[in-house]
């Protein structure tokens, strides 16, 4: 409920770390009343907080958009690049001014398709004045075990494709399980080490 946002801001809004809002409803297509939901909730969050930025993190209805309860790792009925562009053009037109940042999840399409979707997403976001970030998933959708930490080379590839498409900001899902040294997955700590080594090469 929207009123919950007002209650949260009254209790927590004075903290310096309260820098904005994440609207947690995820979608991949222009279905139902998703535009109305994003627009109304985004405007309400900004209204009660003095204009703090709002973010959404949708996904792409690609071949890897498979339920975690399904042993399969891919599907056949997927969105085309053209349909994706058309539907998200309409969504962005409807949420302009209510949503400030869009961070598409990067794990639902094949690696050789990803850069094209990244470029389309950024082109549309630029058109409507939204910031376009990438949400780089740190778990592996290519394995029948749902889910294990992603191999470093795959994560590095996705980050490189985002940079190639002109992205400057990234978030991840999900650090605590798949990348934290404190995770129960031993691979997560190794992924963290590889990432920190990579950051040192940028200094």
Where on the chain are the PLM-derived regions?
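A short acidic (Asp/Glu
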Residues: 32-35, 66-69, 114-115, 144-147, ...
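Short, small-residue-biased leader/transition segments that mark boundaries at the very start
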Residues: 2-9
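Alpha-helical scaffolding segments of alpha/beta enzyme cores, especially the outer helices
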Residues: 7, 36-47, 90, 116-123, ...
């Amino acid at each position: 409920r929207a009123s919950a946002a007002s209650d949260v801001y009254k209790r927590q809004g004075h903290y310096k770390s309260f820098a904005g809002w994440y609207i947690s409803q995820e979608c991949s297509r222009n279905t139902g009343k998703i535009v109305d939901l994003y627009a109304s909730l985004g405007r309400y969050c900004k209204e009660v907080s003095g204009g703090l930025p709002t973010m959404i993190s949708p996904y792409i209805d690609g071949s890897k958009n498979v339920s975690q309860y399904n042993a399969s790792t891919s599907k056949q009925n997927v969105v085309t690049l053209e349909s994706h562009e058309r539907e998200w053009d309409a969504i962005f037109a409807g949420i302009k001014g209510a949503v400030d940042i869009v961070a598409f999840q990067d794990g639902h399409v094949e690696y050789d398709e990803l850069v094209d979707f990244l470029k389309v997403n950024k082109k549309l976001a630029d058109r409507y004045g939204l910031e376009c970030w990438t949400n780089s998933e740190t778990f592996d959708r290519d394995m029948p075990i749902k889910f294990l930490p992603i191999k470093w080379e795959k994560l590095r590839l996705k980050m490189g494709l985002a940079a190639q498409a002109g992205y400057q900001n990234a978030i991840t899902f999900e650090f605590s399980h798949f990348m934290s040294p404190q995770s129960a997955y031993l691979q997560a700590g190794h992924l963290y080490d590889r990432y920190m080594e990579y950051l040192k090469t940028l200094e």
